[in-house]
Amino acid sequence: EDDQVKEATPAEPLAETKSAGAAELIATLEESGLDVIFEHGVTVGEVEGLEVARIVSGENGDRIDVGVGAHDREAFGLLYGELPTAQAIQQVANVVRTHRAPGAEPHPLNRLGSERWLRAHLISQPERVGMRRLSAAAPPIQRTNLKEAVPAVAKGVSLDGRDTVIVSAVGIDLDLVPFAADARLLHDPDAELKIAVPQRDAHKILKDLV
């Protein structure tokens, strides 16, 4: 009957999508000191959790576009299109690195992607969350732009040898716990799941949801 309650059937988890980018372009990002992140078919280079370069596909093949976000990449290409790619990356990365360093003065560049900044610092210091090693992983849903606050996912091995998925977030997000569960389902349903937030955001509401 229409008024009967039935058990919900979960959908199949999303498959990981192969990211675009020729090996030499990925190597350029790495040699420029960027963290190379693969998410849902997109390959980007980040500094302290903020995208500063992206591999894009065009009529003439794959290339690296430099800049923070789509509009900045377009503007940077118009103004500095003749710069060698590595030099262009370094120019943008140096500016971003200055503003995203711990203790930096408030600036638009350190207000974007706070959750990814947190993930980047946990990856560089995994022992802070009881991990032996960590690497960035794709979220269960794709971000549509840099201003969209989507929890950042990482996976790795804990100090006691357990496969673990860690989801980082900043602020109070009532969808964080189900999001984290979906992230584990995507990467490893049998893994231990941890949620990392700043101390100020470890609210009782979040603990109750967990």
Question: Which role does the model predict for each range below?
Answer:
Residues 1-210:
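Charged, terminal alpha-helix-loop-beta segments
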